[in-house]
């Protein structure tokens, strides 16, 4: 019997892991076809092993070993694509699965603790497990035994390849947030769906690189467009985002415009799934605020359009016979908001968006909803996460409303960033250089623990200068608005619609007072955090409250 074999001493770089993501040892022997690397994020500790991998789809590690003549050879280690029986084990307990040759046995294990697949124990000897018998004949090159072992070796490689390909196929078919392959609306239920080839699409230059996609500037039929190119391994992320963009009625001035979806690639690179979207040459909100300051009119336009876009996303409505469900964005950040030519905002990057449960929702939209607490609690950029996401106390009983409230917290941080670059809110009309929310307190790359300590334990928020409450523009409601949006109690926060109302009242105080039925004082006091009802008619009419702000000016910083 073999004792416990420690394969590697895990490096510190691999040990610094997220408390909510399983981290496993990652290894694939040379010659193994396919890879399970796409089931997680590889932690590269150097030019060679050891490496770790943070699992994306499960909390389960696995290992595959080949025991030949009493000697163990590692074939594969990594993440499984789902939590399966055996994942509850704290240790790697190998189980024999196949006998590629009389003297060789293939063992596998699964376990559910960090790096548990680094060590394996109690591997029984391979081959004959009975009493000692006659010595095995030696394999002579070219002889029948040698040929049999060669064929069995080839069989072993093919078997491992089939296992890997099966894992990858399951992962590719997975709808984001779910545990089983299910069709998305309009997909026809076919995992191997053929996407149209976008032959007329031309790629120009890379404008942004992310974890699952690269965004290019390009042209389609003469129109300048943005191309979000996904690698073939990220088909699940592509399908999830496309499903949200293709929902009936999801067309709005302050939501990034979806044009089409298909497949293609720049030049010699492999063809992959693509989303073609409207191009916004002014770039992201973060980029714009870094480069420019704005006057009061421009700042209000950005703030009001951002709130209007989020209110539209959150709203459930029927319009012209078409149904639009409520949608939670879950990844609002100044990188995911784009600036239009008129300096208003358009919300983009719907890769983590979730369709919310609604009273009139058609059954066909069910696959776009999560199927478990882990999928609901998954969120985007840490800096903008609501306190209830940082400490995992989000209300899972009414998760739809809870996610909307979390979005409003993120909205408040974006409003603060916009207002921090407003020249009219400073006595000298010279705002300081742009900083992200919490950058002054925690720096440019805060950890989840640092954010938890500041935003949850200490209940601190970005500083609101006193000049914001006594400037010539008289924005008396700014401090109250922000505090009502980033309140530590999610139930005390405003809805996105009410934020829209209050900003409209700041932009047009005379308009808000002229329409008491549709705009009750811009909802300064009585707008509930829960969705509007007959008792709280805080639902503006497009023709009265939501007039466009006249275009202001932006000053180069």
UniProtKB/Swiss-Prot annotation:
Q: Does the keyword 4Fe-4S apply?
A: no
Gene Ontology molecular function: anti-Mullerian hormone receptor activity; ATP binding; hormone binding; metal ion binding; protein homodimerization activity; transforming growth factor beta receptor activity; transforming growth factor beta receptor activity, type II
Q: Which residues lie on this side of the membrane: Extracellular?
A: 18-144
Disulfide pairs here are 55-79, 92-109
Ordered alphabetically, the record's keywords are: ATP-binding, Disulfide bond, Glycoprotein, Kinase, Magnesium, Manganese, Membrane, Metal-binding, Nucleotide-binding, Receptor, Serine/threonine-protein kinase, Signal, Transferase, Transmembrane, Transmembrane helix
PROSITE patterns given in the database record: PROTEIN_KINASE_DOM (PS50011)
Q: What is its main location?
A: membrane
Q: Which reaction does it catalyse?
A: L-threonyl-[receptor-protein] + ATP = O-phospho-L-threonyl-[receptor-protein] + ADP + H(+); L-seryl-[receptor-protein] + ATP = O-phospho-L-seryl-[receptor-protein] + ADP + H(+)
**Similarity comment: family membership:** Belongs to the protein kinase superfamily. TKL Ser/Thr protein kinase family. TGFB receptor subfamily.
Q: Kindly state the subunit structure of this protein.
A: Interacts with type I receptor ACVR1.
Q: What is this protein called?
A: Anti-Muellerian hormone type-2 receptor
Biological source species: Rattus norvegicus
């Amino acid at each position: 019997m073999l004792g416990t074999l420690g394969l590697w001493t895990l490096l510190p770089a691999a040990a610094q892991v997220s408390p909510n993501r399983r981290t496993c040892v990652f290894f694939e022997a040379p010659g193994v076809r396919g890879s399970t690397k796409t089931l997680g994020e590889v932690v590269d500790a150097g030019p060679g092993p050891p490496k770790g991998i943070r699992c994306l789809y499960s909390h389960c590690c696995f290992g595959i070993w080949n025991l030949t003549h009493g000697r163990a050879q590692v074939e594969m280690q990594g993440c499984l694509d789902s939590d399966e029986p055996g994942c509850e084990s704290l240790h790697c307990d190998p189980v024999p699965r196949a006998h590629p040759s009389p003297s060789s046995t293939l063992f596998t294990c699964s376990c559910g603790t960090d790096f548990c697949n680094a060590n394996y124990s109690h591997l029984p000897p391979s081959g004959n497990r009975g009493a000692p018998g006659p010595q095995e004949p030696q394999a002579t090159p070219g002889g029948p035994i040698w040929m049999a072992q060669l064929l069995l070796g080839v069989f072993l490689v093919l078997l491992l390849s089939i296992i890997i390909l099966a894992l990858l196929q399951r992962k590719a078919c997975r709808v984001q947030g779910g545990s089983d392959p299910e069709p998305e609306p309009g997909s026809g239920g076919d995992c191997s769906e053929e996407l149209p080839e976008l032959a007329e699409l031309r790629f120009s230059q890379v404008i942004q690189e992310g974890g699952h996609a690269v965004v290019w500037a390009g042209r389609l039929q003469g129109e300048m467009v943005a191309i979000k190119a996904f690698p073939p391994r990220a088909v699940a992320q592509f399908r999830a985002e496309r499903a949200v963009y293709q929902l009936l009625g999801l067309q709005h001035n302050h939501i990034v415009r979806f044009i089409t979806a298909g497949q293609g690639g720049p030049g010699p690179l492999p063809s992959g799934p693509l989303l073609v979207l409207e191009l916004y040459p002014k770039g992201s909100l973060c980029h714009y605020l870094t480069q420019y300051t704005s006057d009061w009119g421009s700042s209000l336009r950005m703030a009001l359009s951002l709130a209007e876009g989020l209110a539209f996303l959150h709203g459930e409505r029927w319009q012209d016979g078409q149904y639009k469900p409520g949608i939670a964005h879950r990844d609002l950040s100044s990188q995911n908001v784009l600036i239009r030519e008129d300096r208003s905002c358009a919300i983009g990057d719907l890769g983590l968006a979730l369709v919310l449960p609604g009273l009139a929702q058609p059954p066909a939209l069910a696959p776009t909803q999560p199927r478990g607490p882990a999928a609901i609690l998954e969120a985007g950029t840490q800096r903008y996460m609501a306190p209830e996401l940082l400490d995992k106390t989000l209300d899972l009983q009414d998760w739809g409303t809870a996610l909307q409230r979390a979005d409003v917290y993120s909205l408040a941080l974006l409003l603060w960033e916009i207002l921090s670059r407003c020249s009219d809110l400073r006595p000298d009309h010279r705002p300081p250089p742009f900083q992200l929310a919490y950058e002054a307190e925690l720096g440019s790359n805060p950890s989840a623990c640092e954010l938890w300590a500041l935003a949850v334990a200490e209940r601190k928020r970005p500083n609101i200068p006193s000049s914001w409450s006594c400037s010539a523009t008289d924005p008396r409601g700014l401090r109250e608005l922000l505090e009502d949006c980033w309140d530590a109690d999610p139930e005390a926060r405003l809805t996105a619609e009410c934020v829209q109302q209050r900003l409209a009242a700041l932009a047009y105080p005379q308009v808000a007072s002229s329409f008491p039925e549709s705009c009750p004082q811009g909802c300064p006091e009585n707008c509930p955090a829960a969705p509007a009802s007959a008792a709280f008619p805080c639902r503006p009419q497009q023709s009265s409250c939501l007039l466009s702000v006249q275009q202001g000016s932006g000053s180069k910083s």
